[in-house]
């Protein structure tokens, strides 16, 4: 009798374990399929965007009307921006693809800077048309290479997840067709992009992709990176894995993953090899019922920054918002009463227990430096006179921002309203030009079940 019961219980346990394993396998396959679909979508969109880019640049070469040329160049700039976005969604962060991205930036910067000037007063000269023709030829080379990769992907049913795993393991990469093809794209772009002269009137405005080699401190080991990561683990039960960044990249970081098997929580981090500075942190866990206020969450975020060596006395809060049960905050350093927006630090705090679940200091670490900040050439009153007459100005301060051309400019930052909408406007403190206008989000209404 007892033996029969034990056999039955054991049988149920085996069936249950098998079913659990089957469900786990199904969930894993679903996640992998979702990632693969996203990679495939981004790649095919990139190929289509480069096709569009080549055609659009060719169209501008045939135009004779300055009235038509300006919007066409804006289209070129828009397409290059979309192509950049597609590249960022591919698993290429661990392999060099800098030359191709740099060429896209050159095309985008040239087209934008040319389109915003008065082409009736200052039309394209002979050198600029020559430069545009070179960019047209180079975009054709990228187009042909990407079409070749697309043909291989579709004809051989190649998977992008294999690319991600090959790059992460740094093993047998030479056997991966997609990796080899993208290396060919990068090699060919590097061969011709160095000879592209966009003329004396053009200064590249591409924001340099900075690494962390300029940071203070010594080079840390994997073990030291692990010890630093342990400070961010909520308890001792986390298993920590450290991975170096890929070869020939400018990331200069250790990538950390920390897993808690009991709570099914995962923390991902990047820590700089030089100085051991945390670059970003993301904690993937369920946030339960809210128990602390948004203001308390901001105080927890500041305490986190102070604990990790940031001078919190020099920080001002720029953004404070709540999304569901998570507080989102942005802090900006202030120097001589000027807000330094290129050095912003962003945080997410869970409002159930005040734990930091998101942190990014990448902008701060790459941009923080001593600057000579010029004095405003126009007064605050002169800056206000440049605004739309319907704007009611509520607040004004000086701020350093990065404009659409990737240049740092000193501005008057003004918060103003038009009826029920709030706007943030930036007026160049040197020449009074309008650099940027942002509409701030209104408070979201809360809908309850009727």
Curated annotation (Swiss-Prot):
Question: Carries keyword RNA-binding?
Answer: no
User: Taxonomically, which superkingdom?
Assistant: Bacteria
Listed A to Z, the keywords are: Germination, Sporulation
The UniProt record describes its induction as:
Expression is sigma G-dependent.
One Pfam match, given by its short name, reads: YPEB_PepSY1-2
The GO biological-process annotations, alphabetized, read as: spore germination; sporulation resulting in formation of a cellular spore
Summarize the protein's role.
Required for spore cortex hydrolysis during germination. Appears to be required for either expression, localization, activation or function of SleB.
Protein family (similarity comment): Belongs to the YpeB family.
Q: What is this protein called?
A: Sporulation protein YpeB
Gene behind this protein = ypeB
């Amino acid at each position: 009798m007892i033996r029969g019961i034990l056999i039955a219980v054991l049988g149920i346990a085996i069936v249950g374990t098998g079913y659990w394993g089957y469900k786990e396998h199904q969930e894993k396959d679903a996640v992998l399929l979702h990632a693969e679909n996203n990679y495939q979508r981004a790649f095919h969109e990139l190929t289509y965007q480069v096709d569009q880019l080549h055609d659009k640049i060719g169209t501008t070469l045939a135009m004779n009307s300055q009235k038509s040329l300006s919007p066409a160049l804006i289209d070129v700039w828009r397409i290059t921006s979309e192509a950049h976005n597609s590249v960022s969604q591919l698993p290429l962060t661990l392999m060099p693809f800098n030359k191709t991205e740099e060429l896209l930036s050159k095309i985008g910067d040239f087209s934008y800077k040319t389109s915003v000037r008065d082409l009736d007063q200052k039309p394209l000269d002979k050198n600029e048309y020559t430069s545009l023709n070179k960019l047209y030829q180079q975009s054709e080379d990228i187009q042909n290479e990407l079409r070749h990769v697309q043909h291989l992907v579709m004809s051989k049913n190649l998977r992008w997840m294999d690319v991600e795993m090959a790059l992460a393991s740094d093993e047998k990469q030479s056997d991966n067709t997609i990796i080899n093809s993208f290396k060919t794209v990068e090699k060919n772009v590097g061969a011709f992009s160095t000879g592209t002269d966009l003329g004396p009137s053009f200064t590249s405005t591409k924001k340099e992709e900075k690494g962390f080699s300029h940071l203070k401190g010594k080079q840390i080991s994997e073990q030291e990176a692990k010890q630093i990561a342990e400070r961010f683990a909520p308890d001792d039960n986390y298993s920590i894995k450290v991975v170096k960044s890929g070869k020939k990249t400018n990331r200069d970081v250790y990538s950390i993953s920390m897993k808690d098997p009991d709570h099914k929580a995962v923390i991902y981090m990047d820590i700089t090899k030089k100085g051991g500075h945390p670059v970003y942190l993301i904690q993937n866990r369920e946030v339960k019922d809210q128990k602390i206020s948004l203001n308390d969450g901001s105080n927890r975020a500041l305490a986190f920054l102070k604990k990790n060596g940031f001078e919190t006395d020099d920080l001002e809060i720029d953004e404070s918002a709540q999304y569901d049960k998570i507080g989102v905050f942005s802090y900006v350093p202030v120097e001589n009463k000027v807000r330094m927006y290129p050095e912003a630090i962003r945080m997410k705090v869970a409002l159930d227990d005040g734990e930091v679940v998101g942190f990014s200091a990448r902008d701060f670490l790459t941009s923080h430096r001593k600057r000579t900040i010029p004095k405003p050439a126009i007064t605050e009153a002169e800056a206000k006179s440049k605004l739309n007459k319907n704007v009611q100005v509520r607040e004004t301060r000086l701020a350093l921002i990065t404009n659409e051309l990737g240049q740092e400019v000193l501005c008057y930052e003004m918060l103003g309203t038009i009826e029920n909408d709030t706007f943030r406007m930036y007026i160049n403190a040197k020449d009074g030009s309008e650099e940027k206008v942002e509409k701030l989000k209104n408070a979201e209404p809360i809908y309850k079940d009727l």
